[in-house]
């Protein structure tokens, strides 16, 4: 009988999780269509010929809104499992979550005071 300890399972998972993307990328490279003409290298704009240059500058405020969104989206990802297991975690986990939320509220107030949330 062959018995695996915890490290062999980890090693097997590491090998499989490394081989799957490598095999998928290799298969896609081998099976993709080769060549193509100049039509393949043009940008796609709703089936119409592109007009003008593609290098336009976006307002920096788009990036600020996106950054604030990502911060609070990550907050949700961290707080959801905590809320699901709230009854089993105890007081220490509650205090840690409050500290985490307080840091994010301070970051929100800082972004608000700096004008990152205003569009003018």
From Swiss-Prot:
Superkingdom of this protein's organism: Bacteria
GO molecular function, one term: quinone binding
Keywords, ordered alphabetically: Membrane, NAD, NADP, Plastoquinone, Quinone, Thylakoid, Translocase, Transmembrane, Transmembrane helix, Transport
Keyword Translocase recorded: yes
Annotated InterPro entries: NAD(P)H_OxRDtase_bac/plastid (IPR023043), NADH_UbQ/plastoQ_OxRdtase_su3 (IPR000440), NDAH_ubi_oxred_su3_sf (IPR038430)
Residue intervals passing through the bilayer: 2-22, 64-84, 89-109
Cysteines engaged in disulfide bonds, as pairs: none
GO CC annotation, single: plasma membrane-derived thylakoid membrane
Membrane topology, from the record: Multi-pass membrane protein
Catalytic activity as recorded in UniProt: a plastoquinone + NADH + (n+1) H(+)(in) = a plastoquinol + NAD(+) + n H(+)(out); a plastoquinone + NADPH + (n+1) H(+)(in) = a plastoquinol + NADP(+) + n H(+)(out)
Short name of one Pfam family: Oxidored_q4
GO biological-process terms attached to the record: photosynthesis, light reaction
General function of this protein: NDH-1 shuttles electrons from an unknown electron donor, via FMN and iron-sulfur (Fe-S) centers, to quinones in the respiratory and/or the photosynthetic chain. The immediate electron acceptor for the enzyme in this species is believed to be plastoquinone. Couples the redox reaction to proton translocation, and thus conserves the redox energy in a proton gradient. Cyanobacterial NDH-1 also plays a role in inorganic carbon-concentration.
Family named by the database record: Belongs to the complex I subunit 3 family.
Entry-linked PANTHER family: NADH-UBIQUINONE OXIDOREDUCTASE CHAIN 3 (PTHR11058:SF9)
Protein name: NAD(P)H-quinone oxidoreductase subunit 3
Organism in which the protein naturally occurs: Picosynechococcus sp. (strain ATCC 27264 / PCC 7002 / PR-6)
């Amino acid at each position: 009988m062959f018995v695996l300890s915890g490290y062999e399972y980890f090693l097997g998972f590491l090998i499989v999780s490394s081989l799957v993307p490598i095999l998928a990328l290799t298969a896609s490279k081998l099976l993709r269509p080769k060549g193509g003409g100049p039509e393949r290298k043009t940008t796609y704009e709703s089936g119409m010929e592109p007009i003008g240059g593609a290098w336009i500058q976006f307002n920096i405020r788009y990036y600020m809104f996106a950054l604030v969104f990502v911060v609070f989206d990550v907050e949700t990802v961290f707080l959801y499992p905590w809320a699901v297991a709230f009854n089993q975690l105890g007081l220490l986990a509650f205090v840690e979550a409050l500290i985490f939320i307080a840091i994010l509220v301070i970051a929100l107030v800082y972004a608000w005071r700096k004008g990152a949330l205003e569009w003018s």
